[in-house]
Amino acid sequence: ETLFDPCSTQDIKKVGV
């Protein structure tokens, strides 16, 4: 699992970018 992955929509939603 990547902490910061702009390619993953789920990650973006998780981080709140």
UniProtKB/Swiss-Prot annotation:
Purpose of the protein: Prevents juvenile hormone from being hydrolyzed by general esterases by combining with it specifically.
Subcellular location: Secreted
Keywords: Secreted
GO cellular component, one term: extracellular region
Superkingdom as given in the UniProt entry: Eukaryota
Name of the protein in question: Juvenile hormone-binding protein
